């Protein structure tokens, strides 16, 4: 028993130490295994900073785009449990809602959801329709997924640029540059609650409701968050 108390005391001391230096106990995020070319990374970061500067001055719009999904079994959140309390998310047949979303630092959001596997033609159609409703030159930041680099998108880029829509591709393996990653983390970790995973209907309704409320009732201070 004495040994057990000693181990517990050590854990408390470790926790106290980390809290005292400003550390937080949180989920460890995954990073891609690859490493981008230093030269390409430096060049892209410099160009991104230029776009950020123009956007902050109101000269352009800069959206950060990405795909993600919500799934009845893929994500199980943390939660506090009292001793003897059985907190759980019921297991059920896996259901998945795929999301393509774009957000800027002023919480302007555009996107769509689908139960289908994210097809390139849906992304293309969305961007094409989006290009008809621009108030100023608009840049959409994307990663290098094949769905963003397909032949049809390449063919339409000159037409989109005539309308004022420009695509900017991140360097490979650089999700930390995309604030849409912050959006997805907050969506799954805060706006979707543990009880929302009870059924797929509740989960997908909550997801769509949260996405529709971005910039209105739900906002992110991106200066306090990193992707």
Question: What is each of the regions a protein language model found here?
Answer:
Residues 1-227:
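Short functional hotspots at interaction and active-site rims
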């Amino acid at each position: 028993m004495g040994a057990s108390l000693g181990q517990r005391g050590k854990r408390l001391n470790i926790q106290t130490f980390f809290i005292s230096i400003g550390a937080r106990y949180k989920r460890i995020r995954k990073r891609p295994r690859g490493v981008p070319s230093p030269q390409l990374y430096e060049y892209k970061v410099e160009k991104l900073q230029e776009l950020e500067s123009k956007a902050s001055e109101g000269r352009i719009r800069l959206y950060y785009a990405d795909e993600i999904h919500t799934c009845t079994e893929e994500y199980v959140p943390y939660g506090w449990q009292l001793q003897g309390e059985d907190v759980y998310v019921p297991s059920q047949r896996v259901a998945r809602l795929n999301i393509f979303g774009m957000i800027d630092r002023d919480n302007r959001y555009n996107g769509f959801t689908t139960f289908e596997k994210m097809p390139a033609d849906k992304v293309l159609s969305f961007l094409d329709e989006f290009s008809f409703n621009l108030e100023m030159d608009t840049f959409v930041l994307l990663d290098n997924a094949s769905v963003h680099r397909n032949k049809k998108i390449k063919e339409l880029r000159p037409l989109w640029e005539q309308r004022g829509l420009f695509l900017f591709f991140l360097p490979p393996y650089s999700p930390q540059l995309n604030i849409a990653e912050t959006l997805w983390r907050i969506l799954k970790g805060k706006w979707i609650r543990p009880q929302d995973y009870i059924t797929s209907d509740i989960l997908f309704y909550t997801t769509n409701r949260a996405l529709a409320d971005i910039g209105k009732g739900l906002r992110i201070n991106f200066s306090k968050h990193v992707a």
